[in-house]
Amino acid sequence: MKEKKGHYVPPSYIPLTQSDADTEVETTTPNLEIAVSESTKDDPRQWSSGICACFDDMQSCCVGLFCPCYIFGKNAELLGSGTFAGPCLTHCISWALVNTICCFATNGALLGLPGCFVSCYACGYRKSLRAKYNLQEAPCGDFVTHFFCHLCAICQEYREIREQSSGSYPLDMKMAITNAPLAQTMESAN
């Protein structure tokens, strides 16, 4: 297995009904039967990176911060929406246009309202990503995650898609393959 530098692994989630002491006892007692049964379950898996692990991948962090509609459109395209432009433009319009209207109409009082519109739209893609890769609904529900941490959420989704597709890259995540043209000759008409 190849080790990655800067690869963040989020801590395991502890259910509210379980204490930290119970978790330590379970993790310090290795049992082969438990390991085998856990690997065969269909329990949701953890995300490959945490919601706040944006700085582990500076490229997606910068693009997600300065042009979130691009990352969102790329995520939607890789999840099977069939197009990049539709989700990208919808995200851009729902974020920028509604934000501008709310800001000017209320003198800045409802500046956070557009987050609700974007969250309603984006949480559907997060849900389909979780279903596709059997991921936990963490750190919160899909809507709440996008409502409070939208930029971090789309960067996390982008990192997850890239991590899951490593080794079997989709066509648009690697360099284009160009074949040389066939040799051609010209013949005279005489």
Swiss-Prot record:
Signal peptide: none annotated. The chain crosses the membrane at residues 78-98, 108-125. One of its GO terms (cellular component) is membrane. It is a multi-pass membrane protein. The keyword Transmembrane applies. The keyword Membrane applies. May be involved in cadmium resistance. NCBIfam families: A_thal_Cys_rich. This is Protein PLANT CADMIUM RESISTANCE 10. It comes from Arabidopsis thaliana (Mouse-ear cress).
